[in-house]
Each structure stands twice: as C-alpha cells, then as structure tokens.
Design a protein with these regions (language model features):
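Structured soluble/peripheral alpha/beta segments that form catalytic or ligand/cofactor-binding pockets
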Residues: 1-333
C-alpha cells in the first residue's frame, strides 16, 4: 500500500528530476506576484547549545487558505497585506509578530532584500545571505553560504513550489550578557503557491545536523482521514550530494505532552513528547532511525502551529548518532 501511495504522490508532485540536479543559484525568490499569492522564506538552524537549542526565521507573505498554514480570522487587516513572522528559539518563545506589508515592511520585488520592522532583515546577494534578528530576549546575526545541495519538497507546476538548500553558516547568538559564535549547517528555504484552500490537516518537518558535513530532513503532510500527501527523508552534504528516500518510511508518536497548547485562534493542539521515525535505503536496509524526546520549547508562529527542538539518539548509515534536532509541528485534525 505504501508503494502505491508513494507512486500516486509522485505523479502529482513532480520533484523526482529536480532532486537529481544541483541548486541553481539564480533561482527566483520573488515576493508575491501574479498567481503566486503566498510566498514563504525560511532559515532554520538546529543543534545549537543552550540556551538557544535552535533558531528559525519563518516568513509567510499573504494569509494562506490552507488550514495548517494560515488563519484568516487572525489577520489584523487585509489578509493579502499580512506578513506573518516568527523568529523562534528556546529563549524567544514569543517571537511571533504580524505586519502590514504595505506599511511596516521593506521588500524588493525579487526577494533579495526583506525587512520586517526592527525584528528581522534578510539580504541575499551573489556572495551569500545575511540575517539580522532582534527580540527583547535575544539577537542573532548570521551569514549563510549556500551549497549546491538542494531538496525539492514540492513541484506542482503552476500551483506550488517548495525547496530547501543546504547552507554553511557562521553567526553570533546573544541572550542577555551571554554570546556564542557558531559555525554550523542550516537551511535556506523558499516556497510559492497559488492561494488555494488545500485540505492539509497535519504537518511536521524536522532537521538534523548528523555531523559537520551532513544534514537530514524529514517531512510528513497529511490530508483528511490521514491520507498522506507527502512523506520522506532527504539527505544532503556540503559536497553537493542530495538524495531522497521514502522506502520503509515510518513515523510514530509514542507519547504526547500532558498539556495541549492553545493557539491564538483557540485551537487546542496535541504536541509530541516521545516519538520516532525511520526510513530505509534503496536496498531496503536501515538508513536512519531516530528516537526523539521534545525539549518542551515550542514557539508559536510556524503557520498555525509551532517550532521547537528535541533531543535525539539513533543510527545513521550503521553508526550511532545523537544531538538536538529541529521540529515543526502543526496538527489541525
């Protein structure tokens, strides 16, 4: 059954050929225009030391009609004029803000320059990407150098595109009087979509830096009745290798947090406490197996859900691994 589902998904979501190609650094990252009513930018950094544990900058321009990515009742004004911003970490749990694109944001049409009040600025040039984020509890300065390793999650021509490029990054993370400088791996992401009321009800996206050169992504999207829309793992490294894996995919929540979280629109969301996932290689043998325990540091503002971190142990390519993973979680079932 799993093979049949993955085949059907592949006929709709045409990413197979794209995921065999290196990243084209001239790829458009334009702001909303024409049919593309929703645009998303993201920078995610897993496996940071305490007190940060993780950092993300999530930008959604426009108010999505898909229930996991937008809630039009929360828009302060015109839903199409709303910019939804999260600068999240374990020390910035209240990093979510909403802005008027026309009155409070400064953006170039090509997406090379993005500024949202005094909270977040992202600039992209031929030489790299810079980020500056500021909240009352913390500030972050990052320089990203994109590699040629890219993972395409979605390519439905004329409807939806979503990709993530592996980046080498160096930055300073400051909380109060404490400051740390870190060289690490992170992601730079872009998505654009026609604003359709797609009935997606569950979404998780997880990022692990398993060593200094290798990053693993896991993602799962479910529709009504638990119908899988997208699921699998992506492995990429700084030398440009990037592979996609769906064979033997499993994802299980063993225990939920005792207290549900209440979103700004009043939805009570179950959050994972203990969970695991795995995927096999093309030969059917174990490729990666993960056991995770949430750090209970979820920050609201990832679409209509949360982002946070978890401690994990497991195996990758027959070797033991452990670290702090990044997790996005939206459950509107």
């Amino acid at each position: 059954m799993s093979t049949v589902v993955d085949f059907v998904i592949g006929q709709i979501n045409r990413t197979r050929d794209l995921n065999r190609q290196p990243f084209d650094h001239a790829t458009s990252v334009a702001t909303p225009h024409g049919r593309w009513g929703i645009v998303h930018y993201g920078i995610m950094v897993p496996n940071l030391p305490d007190p940060f544990r993780f950092f993300d900058a999530i930008v959604i321009l426009g108010t999505a009609r898909a229930p996991i990515f937008g809630k039009r009742s929360l828009a302060a004004g015109d839903p199409g004029d709303s910019a939804w911003i999260l600068t999240g970490s374990a020390v910035t749990p209240n990093g979510f803000e909403q802005y008027s694109i026309a009155d409070q944001c400064d953006m170039s049409d090509d997406g090379a320059h993005l500024r949202f009040g005094d909270q977040l600025a992202i600039d992209r040039t031929i030489s790299g990407i810079t980020l500056s984020a500021s909240r009352p509890q913390a500030s972050v300065q990052l320089t990203l150098n994109p590699t040629s390793a890219v993972s395409h999650f979605a390519h439905i021509p004329g409807v939806y595109d979503h990709w993530s490029v592996l980046c080498q990054a160096e930055g300073t993370f400051t909380a109060g009087d404490n400051s740390l400088t870190r060289k690490t791996l992170c992601t730079y992401e872009y998505a654009r979509a026609v604003n359709l009321p797609l009935p997606f009800l569950f979404f998780t996206y997880q990022i692990l830096n398993v060593d200094e050169k290798t990053q693993v992504l896991m993602t799962e999207v479910l529709g009504p009745a638990g119908l899988p829309v997208h699921r699998g793992a992506y492995i990429r490294d700084v030398d440009g290798a990037a592979t996609t894996h769906t064979r033997g995919y499993e994802h299980t929540v063993h225990e939920y947090c005792p207290d549900q979280l209440t979103t700004p629109d009043g939805h009570k969301m179950r959050m994972p406490k203990r969970f695991g996932w795995r995927v096999a290689g093309d030969d059917g043998a174990e490729l990666i197996t993960i056991d995770g325990t949430s750090n209970d540091d979820f920050a609201y503002g990832l679409g209509t859900g949360y982002a946070g971190s978890y401690h994990y142990t497991g195996r990758f390519r027959d070797a033991p691994i452990a670290g702090t993973g990044y997790i996005e979680w939206i459950d509107r079932r």
